[in-house]
Curated annotation (Swiss-Prot):
GO terms for cellular component: cytosolic large ribosomal subunit; mitochondrion
GO biological process, one term: translation
Family to which the UniProt record says this protein belongs: Belongs to the universal ribosomal protein uL5 family.
Keywords: Mitochondrion, Ribonucleoprotein, Ribosomal protein
Cysteine pairs bridged by disulfides in the record: none
Originating organism: Solanum tuberosum
Location(s) in or outside the cell: Mitochondrion
Primary subcellular site in the record, as a coarse category: mitochondrion
InterPro entries with a match to the protein in the record: Ribosomal_uL5, Ribosomal_uL5_dom_sf
GO molecular function: RNA binding; structural constituent of ribosome
Superkingdom of source: Eukaryota
SUPFAM superfamilies associated with the record: RL5-like
Name of the molecule in the record: Large ribosomal subunit protein uL5m
The UniProt record lists the keyword Ribonucleoprotein: yes
Amino acid sequence: MDQLMFPLYFHYEDVLRQDLLLKLNYANVMEVPGLCKIIVVPKTAPSIKNGKLAMEISCGQKLKQRASTGKSFRSNPFLGSNKDKKGYVSDLARQSTLRGHGMSHFLVRISTVMSLLDSPLEIRERSIQFSMETEFCEFSPELEDHFEIFEHIRGFNVTIVTSANTQDETLLLWSGFLQKDEGETQ
């Protein structure tokens, strides 16, 4: 793998993982928390036709349209899913889950934008949740080129899922990624 292509991956392997191993006093390097996936949901009404296209452009992957199964699932209110009066999800097709290379590329963008915009975030036991407003487009040339698609979208809700066991582990992991970005810009 090219180090320039995945700078956060190498930062995690070479610096952050070792730091977490020492600070959290793990006996086994495989216990050190990492990132599992990133879930991205547009803040838009399901009736907006460009919502799916906006997700494909921002996440860098083609989305498959999911058919309705007729089953209902309880919704995470943070994800902004389209819910009925009882709080059940009726449209699951709007979210995109990123893993692997797509997750790495998106995380590089996220860490850059988070340090520039100072967006508020919520750190939970195994996840980091925050909203990215449309200003996110200004920092991504590929998004800015398609502004007409994003003008009706109020932003994105993002959930980063980790393998951490506690909120403190998640906080250390996230702050390590942000320190990597801050170190490069100074």
